Amino acid sequence: MSNVEKKISQLQQQLNQYNHEYYVLDQPSVPDAEYDRLMTALIDLEKTNPELKTIDSPSQKVGGQALKSFTQVTHQLPMLSLDNVFSLDDFHAFVKRVKDRLNDNQAIVFCAEPKLDGLAVSLRYEHGQLIQAATRGDGSVGENITTNIRTIKSIPLKLMGTPGKDFPDIVEVRGEVFMPKASFDALNTLAKKRGEKGFANPRNAAAGSLRQLDSKITAKRNLAFYAYSLGFVGKLSDGGAESTDLTNDFFANSHHERLCQLKRLGLPMCPEVRLLESEQACDAFYQDILAKRSALSYEIDGTVLKVDEISLQKRLGFVARAPRWAIAYKFPAEEELTCVEDVEFQVGRTGAITPVARLKPVFVGGVTVSNATLHNQDEITRLGLKVNDFVVIRRAGDVIPQIVSVVLDKRPDNAVDIVFPTSCPVCDSAVAKPEGEAVLRCTAGLFCAAQRKEAIKHFASRKAHDVDGLGDKLVEQLVDEKLINTPADLFKLTEIQVSTIDRMGKKSATNLINGLEQAKSTTLAKFIYGLGIREVGEATAANLANHFYTLAAIESASLEDLQNVSDVGEVVAKNIINFFKEEHNLAIVSGLSEVMHWPTIEIKSAEELPLAEQIFVLTGTLTQMGRTEAKTALQSLGAKVSGSVSKNTHFVVAGDKAGSKLTKAQDLGISVLTEDGLVALLAEHGITI
């Protein structure tokens, strides 16, 4: 098995596990950003190695698996998820993509609904009788929960109307099962009285109730249901086989009207559903639902906006896991009040000393939050924060806890000023605040254990050398055991040394040594990035490699030489020069370059570099190629790929969900390429995607 096959297999296993935790167990163990990072890595690898992509890859799934305690049901039509946006600009970008794809300038009418926070299910009616119900599962295969669904009072066991006239033999209805707030409160009150553990939120309660093997328990949970779409609609032959799709024969060409038809058949429809004729009306609907969110009898976490005309939906089609004609416009992060019990100081890879607030645990945005970063002294001054203050905490982007403000009216008598350390809290070395920076830094460099650990973690990270078997915890153990002090020391480790580490058996030790051996083969760009030079990210490292071609040329480059590189200004150039001035850094670089190797970068002629000196910025999601593939293709033609838009940018490539970079490009009058435009440009120069 090749290294690429191993990596793809490893990513698939990880993502399958995380899908299982999130969709089946309702116990996610990693943040969304980490999941997205792994999914992007898998998609990129499968894009460049299509022969290794399997039909059961997580990249082809919506998420989750059927529980083994229930029989499995295969959905005739997949139950897809929705893409998300979090801002008005992103919603407008979605509408623009819809209009661009339709390319006929007609007004778009949307069907708008609250985004219910429950569990997606599919109900199958045959000859008007409810004969089967299933969860979404992984989108293709779900759990058979028919017995439990039949206990929900709002779901009809028999459709109203006349079979053959009002509906065909088979009607599949998709919708959301949820637990009303009042039912949730009553359930948890009862659990408390019994000394039992309650549910964290109504969604978990609904999911747990539907997965009861004893339907009598489900019946007591007072679940509810709203229909939101159709699944397969067709005819049964005498032998029971399903025939062609009859949806258009019985249901309207309007999504909204189809919901009304389902309501007439006896299926409940969310009362807040609206038909809207402009983007402005969609935003007003969003604001209205957000304002009345707390007053609704059920939990929601945003709005769903769908192109109403079914024929347009068919023209727009789908991407792998979601329709192009619908979007979930999510609400901002939730906020709660809590108390700052203490402030501790952490030391990062570059010596930055970051204050972290230790909070009285508070439940916000669906999780318990006990820590929040305070960034730097300026942020603390801006907030006017003291230890023991009451603060408003927000989960920014529903991921990162953030202190929004101090509630001065509730400031206690024992509020204490936050005092920054005068020496490093880890190694006790001197600290300094570089001119023009807001961050206090430890001056000890790799002498500081905290910086050593973070530098080695960075070196081994996926974007750098992706050392298989070397996680953050193991790095900390290796440093604490004094087995390594620098990234170069990694390559001196032996299996015997590693196997002495707690919880590291012979197999794990062998895997790590093999992973380090594989990491010796790299690229100059990854080598530079892995050194962890301040403010030298992936794009800048690649630009340095493609500009200077060799490590020696980068080491000896002058300030002026460095500033001739795309994305390198005076500050970054000085950081690079200062890095290579330090003797201990040079020793590490020398040690690494002795054991690591990379292909020579060929110096191409001007004819071979038709995009020389052209600066490109990639934004949004590319569906025909991965970002890495696009970046590599552009760089092979001489282009510089930058991470930010400026007046010097020549082209911005805007994929799906392009955000602020696209807006800035439009403001600056910079040429914008769609993904199709990029594919065409590359094809002009002999690169076929």
From Swiss-Prot:
Coiled-coil stretches: none
Catalytically driven reaction(s): NAD(+) + (deoxyribonucleotide)n-3'-hydroxyl + 5'-phospho-(deoxyribonucleotide)m = (deoxyribonucleotide)n+m + AMP + beta-nicotinamide D-nucleotide
Alphabetically ordered keywords of this record: DNA damage, DNA repair, DNA replication, Ligase, Magnesium, Manganese, Metal-binding, NAD, Zinc
Pfam families cross-referenced by the UniProt entry: BRCT, DNA_ligase_aden, DNA_ligase_OB, DNA_ligase_ZBD, HHH_2, HHH_5
Residues of the active site: K115
Cofactor: Mg(2+); Mn(2+)
A Gene Ontology BP annotation from the UniProt entry: DNA repair
UniProt binding sites for NAD(+): D32, A33, E34, Y35, D36, S81, L82, E113, R136, E176, K306, K330
A molecular function (GO) term: DNA binding
The protein's enzyme class: ligase
Catalytic activity, EC: 6.5.1.2
GO CC entries: cytosol
Superkingdom of this protein's organism: Bacteria
Positions of the BRCT domain: 606-689
NCBIfam families in the cross-refs: dnlj (TIGR00575), PRK07956.1 (NF005932)
Protein family membership: Belongs to the NAD-dependent DNA ligase family. LigA subfamily.
Role of this protein: DNA ligase that catalyzes the formation of phosphodiester linkages between 5'-phosphoryl and 3'-hydroxyl groups in double-stranded DNA using NAD as a coenzyme and as the energy source for the reaction. It is essential for DNA replication and repair of damaged DNA.
Protein known as: DNA ligase
Primary gene name: ligA
